[in-house]
């Protein structure tokens, strides 16, 4: 519908600017290409505690890619990975999109990896009804980007700490 027209425009622009782009499913054999891309991504982004936590989480996901049964997709242009997304099925209705990275200097790269990953997941798991785009980590820009996809609902996030009895 009309509410996602801006996203379609970004994807159309990306396709015009990168007519030879391709997607490739992430496998243990090509996972290093995602590691390399995310390393470059972090080189150009300002460090903060949330970035450090995310970096650690992504490294762990890469280290345990097969054991965690994650799905992943890379967006490739001119032989270079310019975006990737990874996630895992939560149950028969929900899919968790854990990580999404793209070079923001490439117009439409985020919208395109989001679209292509969503299509791949919809094809692989046709029974799914919801994609969980996860937490915005309190970042206004990330929150705005996630809300631009017109989510069905936003859930409150809670942290729990285990306390010793006594």
PLM features per residue range, with description:
Residues 2, 6, 26-33, 53, ...:
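Short, contiguous, pocket-lining structural segments
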Residues 33-81:
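Short, conserved active-site entrance elements at the starts or edges of catalytic domains
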Residues 18, 66-68, 125-126:
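A structural signal for short coil/turn segments at secondary-structure junctions
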Residues 10, 37, 57-61, 116-117, ...:
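Short, hydrophobic/aromatic alpha-helical segments in well-folded domains
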Residues 13, 40, 61-64, 120-124:
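A generic secondary-structure signal
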Residues 1-47:
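Acyltransferase donor/substrate-recognition loop-hinge adjacent to the catalytic core
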Residues 5-8, 162-166:
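C-terminal "cap" of GNAT-fold acetyltransferases
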Residues 72-163:
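Aromatic (often tryptophan-rich) hydrophobic motifs at membrane interfaces
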């Amino acid at each position: 519908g009309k509410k996602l027209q801006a996203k379609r425009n970004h994807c159309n622009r990306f396709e015009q600017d990168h007519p030879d782009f391709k997607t490739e499913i992430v496998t243990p054999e090509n996972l290093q290409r995602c590691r390399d891309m995310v390393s470059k991504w972090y080189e150009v982004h300002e460090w903060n505690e949330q970035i450090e936590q995310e970096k650690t989480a992504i490294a762990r996901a890469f280290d345990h890619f097969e054991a965690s049964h994650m799905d992943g997709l890379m967006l490739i242009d001119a032989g270079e990975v310019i975006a990737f997304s990874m996630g895992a099925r939560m149950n028969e209705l929900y899919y968790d999109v854990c990580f999404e990275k793209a070079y923001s200097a490439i117009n439409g790269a985020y919208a395109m990896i989001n679209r292509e990953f969503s299509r791949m997941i919809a094809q692989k798991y046709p029974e799914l009804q919801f994609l969980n785009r996860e937490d915005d980590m309190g970042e206004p820009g990330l929150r705005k980007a996630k809300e631009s996809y017109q989510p069905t609902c936003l859930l409150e996030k809670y942290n729990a700490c285990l306390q010793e009895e006594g």
